[in-house]
Amino acid sequence: MVRFKSRYLLFEVLYPEAKEFFDYPTIPSDSSITTSSLSKIIRTMVAENFGDVGIGKVASSLTVKYFSPNTSTGILRVSRQHFRLAWAALVLIRELYGKPVIIRVVRVSGTIKKAELAAIERNKSEIHNISLMDEPIEV
């Protein structure tokens, strides 16, 4: 028996319309965005863009394992054979709950541990960048 092999996609949600927060790298997402609602939205995008064949390929394996509204990052699990289909569906999402968004896949990993470590490293670097922005500039 062959074990189920999957890929984990670390993605971030960007808000292009938020000009008041333009200096900061990430903007928190709405707290109403949950893992289950994201899964439904991604499945809908697969069905709209790739039809019954596309949804048949990814339906059993597509799950959002993690989503943080504070950092607007998430981890999506999908079968290794069809991860590019899920990636394309993520990129095609243009709106979440009425707000225009851009979803960018940051990393593709074979294990959830490596995807989590990549998310932690991204968060650490963003905290460092924000702390550098908040320091006063001496002239």
From Swiss-Prot:
EC number per UniProt: 3.1.26.5
Residues making up the signal peptide according to the UniProt record: none
Record's catalysed reaction(s): Endonucleolytic cleavage of RNA, removing 5'-extranucleotides from tRNA precursor
Keywords: Hydrolase, Nucleus, tRNA processing
Key word tRNA processing present: yes
Keyword tRNA processing: yes
A Gene Ontology cellular-component term: multimeric ribonuclease P complex
Subcellular location: Nucleus
Main location: nucleus
EC top class, as a word: hydrolase
Family according to the record: Belongs to the eukaryotic/archaeal RNase P protein component 2 family.
Job description of the protein: Component of ribonuclease P, a protein complex that generates mature tRNA molecules by cleaving their 5'-ends. Also a component of RNase MRP, which cleaves pre-rRNA sequences.
Protein name: Ribonuclease P/MRP protein subunit POP5
Taxonomic path: Eukaryota, Fungi, Dikarya, Ascomycota, Taphrinomycotina
